[in-house]
Amino acid sequence: MIIEQVVGNIDNISDEILNKLHLENVFVESSNLVKKVQRVVTDHGREIGICLNGQKDLSPGDILYMDERDIIVLNVIPDDLLVIRPSSLRQMGDIAHKIGNRHIPAQFDEIEMLVQYDYLVEELLKQLEVPYTRENKKVKLAFRHVGHSHG
């Protein structure tokens, strides 16, 4: 089976409809959310090729296939993350600057900064006494490495 476009997102499907369908899941690493071409296998052993044409990145809950009997949904494997919770705006700016200088991709929400686990970043957080935890957590976006130059 080749998937060329996402049908929708499971968050927009009613429980009434979902309860009538045979659900299969595809589990991918968050880094694969940006891949337009990939081969995956559902939790029921069905092999699927994904070949998206110019579409936005994949998202957790995307419906890869749906008919009157079956639905195949994309899920993300939890990442090993450092969840950083600075105690002040100054501390947030300082740690964000230091992590940015190391070119480490980060994601933010209202009160947390998320980076993929790195023992050197963990040592930096300990040294600067920045509150953090190490957690396995699902992210909605891939961590993107952004190319740049200093010249």
From Swiss-Prot:
InterPro entries: UreE, UreE_C_dom, UreE_N, UreE_N_sf. One of its GO terms (biological process) is protein-containing complex assembly. One of its GO terms (cellular component) is cytoplasm. It holds the Pfam family UreE_C. Disulfide bonds: none annotated. Gene3D superfamilies: Urease metallochaperone UreE, N-terminal domain, UreE, C-terminal domain. One of its GO terms (molecular function) is unfolded protein binding. It is found in: Cytoplasm. Keywords: Chaperone, Cytoplasm, Nickel, Nickel insertion. CDD domains: UreE. Belongs to the UreE family. Involved in urease metallocenter assembly. Binds nickel. Probably functions as a nickel donor during metallocenter assembly. This is Urease accessory protein UreE. It comes from Lachnoclostridium phytofermentans (strain ATCC 700394 / DSM 18823 / ISDg) (Clostridium phytofermentans).
